[in-house]
Swiss-Prot record:
UniProt keyword annotations, A-Z: Ribonucleoprotein, Ribosomal protein
Keyword Ribonucleoprotein annotated: yes
Presence of keyword Signal: no
InterPro entries in UniProt: Ribosomal_bL32, Ribosomal_bL32_bact, Ribosomal_zn-bd
GO molecular function: structural constituent of ribosome
Recorded superkingdom: Bacteria
PANTHER family associated with the record: 50S RIBOSOMAL PROTEIN L32 (PTHR35534), LARGE RIBOSOMAL SUBUNIT PROTEIN BL32 (PTHR35534:SF1)
GO biological process: translation
Name the record gives this protein: Large ribosomal subunit protein bL32
Family: Belongs to the bacterial ribosomal protein bL32 family.
Phylogenetic lineage: Bacteria, Pseudomonadati, Campylobacterota, Epsilonproteobacteria, Campylobacterales
An example Gene Ontology CC term for this record: large ribosomal subunit
Length: 49
């Protein structure tokens, strides 16, 4: 089992974790031409995409 040779500082750990981001969902164009967020129901047409 691997064991750390020396302690990782808070700053170094934070710099490494700065890339662990969730990408924001981009709106998509619906069949009727309106923009909406993915995986949401359109109130007017009732479509789910």
């Amino acid at each position: 089992m691997a064991v750390p040779k020396r302690r990782v500082s808070k700053t170094r750990a934070a710099k490494r974790r700065s890339h662990y981001k969730i990408a924001l969902a981009k709106p998509i164009k619906d069949k009727d031409g309106s923009w909406k967020m993915p995986h949401h129901i359109n109130k007017f047409t009732g479509s789910y995409k």
